């Protein structure tokens, strides 16, 4: 086989359709653009929301105000009234709450003070409301806050890239 024998695979190369070159070509006169209206002309087309002069739906809708805070932390809540099923004197960790099916491990958990706590429990959570903390301690238990660490992703540096502080970069005066 020589270089001049090489050919593309059948169906791999399609010839360009020459439009606007006579009615016998199948794409003559209007060149596949239909009747000659505004959409058939060259240049910018009307915006997708344009409805022919009728009041468009995008103008009928009220304006969206405000913004969505991308740093908002959404807590899963557990009321202390739900914790009466746990045996007295237990140390309730976040892993045990996940195992019970009360929370999802991907989001932080906050303990709220709705209901009555009749058990002495040591509870680990990311946050406690003031009333929940008071009721847990009144029942003889302890409320221990564990920090919520967000694992940030970076394509180049993997999970949790190091944060650079400006203080570390400034040279110390001698």
Curated annotation (Swiss-Prot):
The keyword Secreted appears for this protein: no
Protein name: Large ribosomal subunit protein uL15
GO CC terms in record: cytosolic large ribosomal subunit
Subunit and partners: Part of the 50S ribosomal subunit.
Biological source species: Roseiflexus sp. (strain RS-1)
Pfam families in the cross-refs: Ribosomal_L27A
A GO term, aspect molecular function: structural constituent of ribosome
Keyword match Membrane: no
NCBIfam families the UniProt entry points to: rplO_bact
A GO biological process held by the record: translation
InterPro entries: Ribosomal_uL15, Ribosomal_uL15/eL18, Ribosomal_uL15/eL18_sf, Ribosomal_uL15_bac-type, Ribosomal_uL15_CS
Keywords: Ribonucleoprotein, Ribosomal protein, RNA-binding, rRNA-binding
Superkingdom assignment: Bacteria
Functional description taken from the UniProt entry: Binds to the 23S rRNA.
Compositionally biased residues, Gly residues: 21-35
Family stated for the protein in its record: Belongs to the universal ribosomal protein uL15 family.
Annotated region described as Disordered, given as residue ranges: 1-57, 147-174
